[in-house]
């Protein structure tokens, strides 16, 4: 018994489409118009353009990723160096009190010889190698960034210049970081310009010359008087 809805074996129900890709119509003999996208060369050109655009896009993405990684690496190295500097500064800061004791011993003459002198020299050499620099000496210009004034002599008037007169405690600097300010006493000194100093020197020289001339004239007068007294009278 056969189902009425069942199609014969010869008819599968699929439609077969046949495309005539001949450029010349066999019936009319005319050249058929083919769209650019349907031409064999047009498809290859479009694929090549698309590939170039994709390569350019991926290249730009790669360059951005490389730039981001380079910036990240720089930041990581900078942060690592900053952490190392902070750790080094923390350790060195704890040794500043030892340096103060050694400085007092040096002023008392206790470091002229002996094992303590060797220890002090080695410690100074090691800290200097790390970049530790001491500052604050008598006669230096006062710098509020480096020095802390606990005494001040002078009125600080116009033309005066503050200099360090007394050092109570040395300051220390590690690289560009100030570990401890120097405690100093400040003295105001008068600044004299070179031209003003030269004019003062010239005036002093003129005054000295005038005094010498007056002294010479006085000596000449005394000599003439003595000669007149020593001559016999004519009577």
From Swiss-Prot:
Question: Which terms does the record give in the GO molecular function aspect?
Answer: adenyl-nucleotide exchange factor activity; protein homodimerization activity; protein-folding chaperone binding; unfolded protein binding
Its localization reads: Cytoplasm
One Gene Ontology term of the biological-process aspect is:
cellular response to starvation
* PROSITE patterns the UniProt entry points to: GRPE
Q: In terms of one coarse class, where is the protein primarily found?
A: cytoplasm
The UniProt regions of compositional bias labelled Polar residues, in chain numbering, are 1-18, 215-235
Residue spans with biased composition (Basic and acidic residues)?
19-35
Which portions of the sequence form the region Disordered?
1-50, 198-235
Asked if the keyword RNA-binding belongs to this entry, the reply reads no
An example of a Pfam family matching this protein is: GrpE
- Keywords, ordered alphabetically: Acetylation, Chaperone, Cytoplasm, Stress response
GO CC annotation terms, alphabetical = cytoplasm; peptidoglycan-based cell wall
Q: How does it assemble?
A: Homodimer.
Extra remark: Was identified as a high-confidence drug target.
Q: Which family does it belong to?
A: Belongs to the GrpE family.
Q: Which PANTHER family match?
A: GRPE PROTEIN (PTHR21237), GRPE PROTEIN HOMOLOG, MITOCHONDRIAL (PTHR21237:SF23)
Q: What is this protein called?
A: Protein GrpE
